[in-house]
């Protein structure tokens, strides 16, 4: 399907498109066209192994071809298929055999090293496991999660194809199966179509469509190479405030590459109340924000172009993993990952969970759980690790200028 056709579909559907002045900005319009199509009801939530996933994969392959990339999937195709056993819930005795597919496009500059730039394109269909929807099954369009990341990846590919930064080759990947457990990226990492020993670094774009007014961009993996902080500390792009964290392990596809000793970064504009709900729609995406994020990433690639192979550094994931895995209870709140102050700010409260029952609200900043002072998200997780189901605790929060005690029963 030609992109102009997709644009007309959006127009006829009455979708709020960019203003005439914004349309002059071709990259901005391109981002919107990609997000609008990938997050349309036509694709029914892009569930891995379903028809909507296939349609999304075909669109990405078409875009790669349009940009002049080379196919880098199995047998010279755009695709790399992987089989998996789908279970509707973890305790199901039997599963359903399914096949998902990664989409791969390659920019060959004749270089020794290859940079991998990826974004998952699958989502939750009509509300598979992981959905936070409390109502009837409904299409989860996943505009921010992760049509935004795919659109950003395509914009980066378009810029790099113009001839900049030619000291690396570039492999662009649309991963599937991320929502079910990083299936696609794990499969590629174990069955690569390039020599991973020559992979310079990996950049993962997952949920980059909700840049806030402060322009805070969360970047994890900054400890996986000494080069990252050296370069990023000197970057000043469009007012972006980079919030760096070291760990190479997280709930997204960069983890699969970190575990192969490849330096990684994960770019993320933050959680929101539409996360994993049917309301994550294209009209809520900050397209100018995506453009700023891609400008930042392109500037980072520019700075690294003459650096040669990046050194890899293991991060302290074992300790963080133990703390994260230790808790058996949850408050049922979504952390604000781009919050830079002390404490753990709540970005969403899930109905029917202990936090909601105790009266916690969006914007509350948790500063203590029981006797555990909370200065960051890791203190928060460590505090939760002290409790089991049925226990009670006093959770202390800042709400504006007020400090409030809330009793929570887990």
Regions found by a protein language model. Give the residues of each.
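N-terminal capping segment at the start of a domain
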Residues: 26-55, 67-73, 201, 205-210, ...
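A non-catalytic alpha/beta surface segment that caps or lines the substrate-entry region
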Residues: 46-107
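Alpha-helical metal-binding/catalytic segments enriched in His/Glu/Asp
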Residues: 105, 117-118, 123, 128-181, ...
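Metal-dependent peptidase/peptidase-like ectodomains
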Residues: 112, 175-266, 286
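PDZ/PDZ-like domain micro-motif
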Residues: 257, 350-364, 383
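His/Asp/Glu-rich mid-to-C-terminal helical/loop segments that flank catalytic regions of hydrolases
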Residues: 273-320
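Conserved PDZ fold ligand-binding element
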Residues: 357-377
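PDZ-domain C-terminal substructure recognizer with occasional recognition of PDZ-binding tails
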Residues: 382-410
């Amino acid at each position: 399907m030609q992109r102009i056709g997709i644009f007309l579909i959006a127009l006829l559907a009455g979708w709020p498109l960019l203003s005439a002045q914004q349309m002059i900005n071709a990259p901005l319009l391109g981002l919107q066209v990609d997000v609008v199509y990938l997050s349309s009801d036509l694709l029914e939530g892009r569930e891995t192994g379903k028809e909507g996933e296939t349609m999304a994969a075909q669109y990405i392959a078409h875009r790669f071809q349009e940009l002049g990339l080379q196919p880098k999937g199995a047998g010279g195709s755009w695709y790399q298929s992987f089989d998996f056993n789908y279970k509707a819930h973890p305790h199901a005795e039997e599963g359903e055999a399914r096949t998902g597919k990664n989409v791969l496009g390659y920019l060959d500059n004749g270089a020794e090293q290859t940079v991998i730039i990826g974004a998952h394109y699958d989502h939750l269909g009509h509300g598979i496991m992981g959905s936070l929807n409390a109502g009837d099954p409904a299409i989860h369009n996943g505009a921010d999660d992760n049509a935004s990341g795919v659109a950003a990846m395509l914009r980066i590919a378009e810029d790099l194809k113009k001839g900049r930064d030619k000291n690396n080759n570039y492999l662009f990947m649309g991963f599937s199966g991320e929502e079910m457990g990083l299936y696609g990226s794990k499969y590629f990492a174990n069955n690569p179509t390039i020599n991973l020993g020559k992979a310079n670094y990996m950049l993962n774009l997952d949920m980059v469509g909700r840049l806030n007014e402060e322009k805070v961009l969360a970047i994890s993996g900054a400890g996986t190479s000494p080069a990252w902080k050296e370069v990023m500390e000197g970057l000043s792009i469009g007012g972006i405030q980079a919030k760096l964290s070291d760990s190479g392990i997280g709930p997204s596809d960069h983890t699969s590459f970190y575990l192969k000793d490849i330096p990684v970064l994960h770019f993320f504009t933050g959680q929101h109340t539409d996360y994993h709900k049917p309301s994550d729609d294209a009209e809520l995406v900050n397209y100018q924000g995506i453009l700023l994020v891609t400008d930042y990433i392109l500037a980072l690639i520019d700075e690294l172009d003459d650096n040669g192979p990046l050194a890899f550094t293991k991060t302290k994931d074992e300790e963080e993993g133990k703390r994260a895995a230790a808790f058996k209870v949850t408050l049922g709140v979504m952390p604000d990952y781009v919050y830079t102050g002390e404490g753990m700010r709540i970005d969403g409260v899930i109905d029917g969970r202990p936090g909601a029952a105790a009266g916690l609200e969006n914007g509350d900043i948790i500063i203590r759980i029981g006797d555990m002072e909370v200065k960051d998200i890791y203190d928060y997780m460590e505090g939760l690790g002290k409790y089991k189901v049925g226990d009670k605790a006093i959770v202390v929060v800042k709400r504006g200028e007020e400090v409030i005690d809330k009793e929570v029963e887990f």
